[in-house]
């Protein structure tokens, strides 16, 4: 039995709409994306296999919203909702924001793939274009700490796209699930812990130490964002260089 037949048959037997449902399960097992009560947005969600997996993962206290220009047949889950529209249209984004109802989004998913031409370079470029569209939506609606999963085909434009994702998240990992077909060049980039800091690594700025943390490092506040700086005292006015950023805090060093 081929891998394709195995996952296809399992999906039929276990009630999943697509064999790709197992890809998301395997990605979550590797990267630890979902948690109970999470709010999840699935872009290009038709026919709904990933919606099913996400709903199971977040449980009855969670919310899962699928967006697609195709109609998504209703699922037997009270926590799943769908929006029919183009995810790049502002009207669709507004409908999504309204449906989320000001709750924090925890995860944005995209398993979108282009219509295949058979020309590898063309198919790769189109897949990166779709991935960038999903990335744009994710950076628009994900708060600090949120996660992003996106499918993309391997090729020359992948490194630049991955670098762009890396600037918005604490780290990025590439996953190729066992459920992917052997003939496919697909992989999934997982951006973990969205960063929304008002500064970037390498930035230099003048600031005042407003407090001392539990580990003895000074605390600087930049538009509400915390930077830890070693070797300073409370009240010091210093010039610092940002060295590293996390979703909620960053680190800097004094410039001598």
UniProtKB/Swiss-Prot annotation:
Its EC number is 2.1.1.166. GO terms for cellular component: cytoplasm. It catalyses: uridine(2552) in 23S rRNA + S-adenosyl-L-methionine = 2'-O-methyluridine(2552) in 23S rRNA + S-adenosyl-L-homocysteine + H(+). Keywords: Cytoplasm, Methyltransferase, rRNA processing, S-adenosyl-L-methionine, Transferase. One of its GO terms (molecular function) is rRNA (uridine-2'-O-)-methyltransferase activity. S-adenosyl-L-methionine binds at residues 48, 50, 68, 86, 111. InterPro entries: NA-bd_OB-fold, RNA_methyltr_RlmE, RNA_MeTrfase_FtsJ_dom, rRNA-MeTfrase_E, SAM-dependent_MTases_sf, TRAM_dom. Disulfide bonds: none annotated. Residues 198-256 form the TRAM domain. It is found in: Cytoplasm. Its main location: cytoplasm. The active site is at residue 151. It holds the Pfam family FtsJ. Belongs to the class I-like SAM-binding methyltransferase superfamily. RNA methyltransferase RlmE family. Specifically methylates the uridine in position 2552 of 23S rRNA at the 2'-O position of the ribose in the fully assembled 50S ribosomal subunit. This is Ribosomal RNA large subunit methyltransferase E. It comes from Haloquadratum walsbyi (strain DSM 16790 / HBSQ001).
